Amino acid sequence: MANSKSAKKRALQSEKRRQHNASRRSMLRSYVKKVIAAINAGDHKAATEAFNAAQPIVDRMATKGLIHKNKAARQKSRLNTKIKALAA
C-alpha cells in the first residue's frame, strides 16, 4: 500500500488511467469485431463501411499509445486484405 502522499496520488492516477484505457481498448475491439463480423457474413459493402469507421479509431489508439503503431498498421492491413478478397 502507498505510504507517502505522492505515492497515494500516483496510485489513484494509475487506477484512473487503467480504467480509461480499458474503456478505450474495449471500444477499439468492438469496432474491429464489427468489421470481422461483416467479413464473415460475406457482406462487402457492410465490411467496407465498418472498416472505414474502424480505421481512424485504430489510428487514434496507436497515437495515444494504447497499441503499438505497427500493430495498428498490421490490423488495418489484414482487415483490408480480407475485404478485398470478398470483392474478388
From Swiss-Prot:
Disordered: annotated segments: 1-27
GO terms, molecular function: small ribosomal subunit rRNA binding; structural constituent of ribosome
A Pfam family: Ribosomal_S20p
GO biological process, one term: translation
Matches recorded under InterPro entries: Ribosomal_bS20 (IPR002583), Ribosomal_bS20_sf (IPR036510)
UniProt entry keywords in alphabetical sequence: Ribonucleoprotein, Ribosomal protein, RNA-binding, rRNA-binding
Transmembrane stretches, start-end: none
Source superkingdom: Bacteria
One annotated Gene Ontology cellular component of this protein: small ribosomal subunit
Protein family: Belongs to the bacterial ribosomal protein bS20 family.
Function of the protein: Binds directly to 16S ribosomal RNA.
Name of this chain's protein: Small ribosomal subunit protein bS20
Annotated organism of origin: Shewanella sediminis (strain HAW-EB3)
Lineage start: Bacteria, Pseudomonadati, Pseudomonadota, Gammaproteobacteria, Alteromonadales
